Amino acid sequence: MSRALLRSVLELRTPVTRLPPSFLLPFRPAARFLHQTAQQVEPTSQSDAAAAAATLLKASPPKVTTATTPEAPAAVPTSTPFSQQPPISQQVKELLPVLAAQPGHYTTIHIHGKPYLVTEGDTVKLPFKMPGVAPGDVLRLNRASVIGSRDLTLQGAPYVDERLFECRAIVMGTESEPMRVMIKKKRRCRKKKHVFSKHKYTVLRINQLKINDVSSL
């Protein structure tokens, strides 16, 4: 036998120990090793720590906080004091005694923003129930836009100075209206709803309407 034939026969008898190509092998990530070095801190003695704490306390003094109570808002005055009101003009001082001497005074009083033309002895039925009043209380009405008589009229801008007149009313009581029944119904619906209402009104009587004297102002 030739040498080439003998060599091929020997290769067939021996087991194959060769590895497959690299692209057929399973993927294995490369192992990475991280080396961490612990930081070594030199221990300090207890005396050094106490001295450092004492210096920190001396350098930063303790802060003292005081609790402050919130201040209540100042109440808005309903009427201006007489000392803060502007002076009365000379023309008003001259004509005010003439107006006071005439009979039959009338005034337009404003109560809760609504005007009422009244004279002394009139009864006013307010369209609401005034809170905080009881029968027998006397109220001073200091918002008047007009004060006049048959010949003279004093017009305010928008109100007459409250030092020029005095208008007082006494609370007579409260009146209630008859019971109202309102029927509410929707279209294409047989159901009806009855709403009952009965409002109350405060009644006042003007018992004083006087124009003050100029000398007392």
UniProtKB/Swiss-Prot annotation:
Its domain of life reads Eukaryota
Q: Which UniProt keywords apply?
A: Mitochondrion
Q: Which GO terms describe its molecular function?
A: structural constituent of ribosome
Q: Where is the composition biased (Low complexity)?
A: 61-81
Compartments (UniProt record): Mitochondrion
Where do the record's region annotations for Disordered lie?
Answer: 61-87
Q: Which Pfam families match?
A: Ribosomal_L21p (PF00829)
Q: Record's Gene Ontology CC terms?
A: mitochondrial large ribosomal subunit
* Family as reported in the entry's similarity comment: Belongs to the bacterial ribosomal protein bL21 family.
Known partners and oligomeric status:
Component of the mitochondrial large ribosomal subunit (mt-LSU). Mature N.crassa 74S mitochondrial ribosomes consist of a small (37S) and a large (54S) subunit. The 37S small subunit contains a 16S ribosomal RNA (16S mt-rRNA) and 32 different proteins. The 54S large subunit contains a 23S rRNA (23S mt-rRNA) and 42 different proteins.
Question: Its biological function?
Answer: Component of the mitochondrial ribosome (mitoribosome), a dedicated translation machinery responsible for the synthesis of mitochondrial genome-encoded proteins, including at least some of the essential transmembrane subunits of the mitochondrial respiratory chain. The mitoribosomes are attached to the mitochondrial inner membrane and translation products are cotranslationally integrated into the membrane.
This one is known as Large ribosomal subunit protein bL21m
